Amino acid sequence: MSWSPLFTDTLCDSIWKKIHEIASIFLHTDSSNPFLMHGDIGDILFLFYYCSETGNEEYYEKTTRLFFDCIDKQKPLLKTDKDIESLSSFENGLSGFGWSLTHFQAQEITSGDVFDTMGTVDPQILRSMIYHVQNDRYGFLQGASGIALYCLNKPDRFAKEYLNRFVWELYKRICSNKLDGSDDFSIPTGLAGLW
């Protein structure tokens, strides 16, 4: 068996053409959703890496503005008294948004303290992670394991304590055979999201 590259020069040109097209769409499309998977912060994540690869200053300036607009859209949610559990998912909620901020900081795309933005809602998000485990919602996108990923990237003691509690709750469910009845083994919503 001989080795051959997955991407030929011709294919790379087609891929870059599509990437440029996606970047243009993201840059010129407004969304009222500030979240990760279907909203602005996901677009911004793509665009920051796009700018890093291409060195496109115009896109970088617009992406930076989009980032601050996204933070502004998020502020009302961060100061709300409503039930955060419904807004805690990784896919379309505050844990995905917080993960993105932590990722940007770790990659030195942004600077600052994530706690300044997320600190008021973190306790509620982390409690909802435990609630999800206790109610058999383990999935990555909408359940406990996505919130756990957010916790893994946080350097603070509070998040680590909740991760320990997450593992303990999961261990209790495994020991009492509570995972045996699950029929959802998918990554996004089921047990595979844990691994």
Model-based region annotation:
Residues 1-65:
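Low-complexity, Ser/Thr/Pro/Gly-enriched N-terminal "stalk/linker" regions
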Residues 1-4, 42-56, 96-110, 146-158, ...:
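Well-ordered alpha-helical scaffold segments within catalytic/enzyme domains
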Residues 22, 26, 50, 63, ...:
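Alpha-helical solenoid scaffolds that mediate protein-protein interactions
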Residues 61-64, 112-119, 161-168:
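Short sequence/structural elements of tandem HEAT/ARM alpha-solenoid repeats
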Residues 94-131:
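Well-ordered mid-protein domain cores that form the structural environment of catalytic cofactors
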Residues 138-195:
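Solenoidal tandem-repeat scaffolds enriched in leucines and small polar residues
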